[in-house]
Each structure stands twice: as structure tokens, then as C-alpha cells.
Amino acid sequence: MLSGQTVVSIQPVVGSPLDKTEFIVAMAVAAEQAGAKALRIEGVENVRHVSQATNVPIIGIVKRDLQDSPVRITPFVCDVDALATAGATIIAFDATDRQRPESRETIANAIKNSGCFAMADCSCFADGQWAAQIGVDIIGSTLSGYVGEIEPTEPDLELVKQFSSAGFFTMAEGRYNTPQLAAKAIENGAVAVTVGSAITRMEVVTHWFNSATQAVRQNNESISY
């Protein structure tokens, strides 16, 4: 069902006027009508309402900011249980080998026991290899570039290629902000591509356009003098 398809991640900028459940549901319905074959939704209540309004699989996550761990994505079994009850089809979790309140094995097993499919949000090939070995269903490149190093501007197509070559069900995710980059992910073996900011974060996209137009203006002004 997801082969060659686009998954839309709907996670508005925190504190944005669009960061309200009713707007998230509206964007989810619009994305489904436009052809999205799955949705990635953060927050239990958001998952609950989106699942009632749409008919495509939902990748559910809970994001937390913990004082004693850098892990943010679905760090607790209670998050898994709540997402499953709310209507998630797939539950994604941070699969990186970092300090965390509950082990990644514990989280993966909880997802399996919930009856949902599991998706590993990975930062490198070792993360994906670990996840595949314990039976995680979907291996994502979600966290490549987000685990301490300087954040790149381009997506990690090489990691997508490595996952695909290893036979993993590969979800390309992270910095796929143009249709051309999404197509390259499929060319490199991704089963599907998740796109977020370029579709659902108005503030981010507006900043991209402003930066581009202002750079030209500044360059022209410097030349004129």
C-alpha cells in the first residue's frame, strides 16, 4: 500500500497558531484528499481525532523533552499504550543507542504486543540493523543528522540506500523538502517518503522563501554600491 507513496507528517511548529488539534485534523483530511497514503501524527489526542476523521494508516508518536535523556520520540511504554488505544496503526520510536528511561527493546516489544506495526526512527545503519534483527517492521532514516552532529541541509540518501540494500522496509524521512528529493529517495530504494515541514509548517516554508528573496536583494544592493 505504501510502495512509492508519500507520507505526510503533520507536526506544526510548537506554539504556532496552527498547533491546535482542529487544524491538525483539517490538514490531515486535506493531505488524504490530495493522495497521502499515511500520516505521521504527534500526540495522543491528535492521533485520536485524526484517526476518526481519516481512512489512511497513522504513524503515531509522542514527543517528550526529558531532563535526563536526549531521546524524544516515544520514550515510554505508557506512550505506546496510549497511542495504540488512540488509533495509531504504526507506532514510531527512537531506535538510537543512547541513554534513555526505558530500553529500546522494551519499547519495541511493547509496540509488538499492542498489535500495531513498529517503526524505528534511526540515525545510522547500526540503528537500523539492530531494529531489523529484532523484527521491527519499518526502518526509517528519521534521525540521521539529528543526534548531536551539525545538522545537514540535505537528506541522507546514502543511509536510505544502505537500508534498502540490506533488505529493510525503508522509510525515507528527514529534510525531504522538494518533490525532486522525494523522488531520489525512491530511486535509492525507499519504499515510501515522509514529508513534513515542506507541507505542513507554514512558518518554516515562509522563512525559506524570505531567506532566498532577501539574499538576492542584499546581493543586488552590494553590487550597486
Curated annotation (Swiss-Prot):
Pathway: Amino-sugar metabolism; N-acetylneuraminate degradation; D-fructose 6-phosphate from N-acetylneuraminate: step 3/5
GO biological process entries: carbohydrate metabolic process; N-acetylmannosamine catabolic process; N-acetylneuraminate catabolic process
Pfam families: NanE
Keyword Isomerase belongs to the record: yes
GO cellular component: cytosol
One example GO MF annotation: N-acylglucosamine-6-phosphate 2-epimerase activity
InterPro entries: Aldolase_TIM, NanE, RibuloseP-bd_barrel
EC number(s) stated in the UniProt entry for this protein: 5.1.3.9
UniProt keywords, alphabetically: Carbohydrate metabolism, Isomerase
Catalysis performed (reactions): an N-acyl-D-glucosamine 6-phosphate = an N-acyl-D-mannosamine 6-phosphate
Presence of keyword Coiled coil: no
Functional summary from the UniProt entry: Converts N-acetylmannosamine-6-phosphate (ManNAc-6-P) to N-acetylglucosamine-6-phosphate (GlcNAc-6-P).
Record HAMAP family: ManNAc6P_epimer (MF_01235)
Family: Belongs to the NanE family.
Protein name: Putative N-acetylmannosamine-6-phosphate 2-epimerase
Annotated organism of origin: Vibrio vulnificus (strain YJ016)
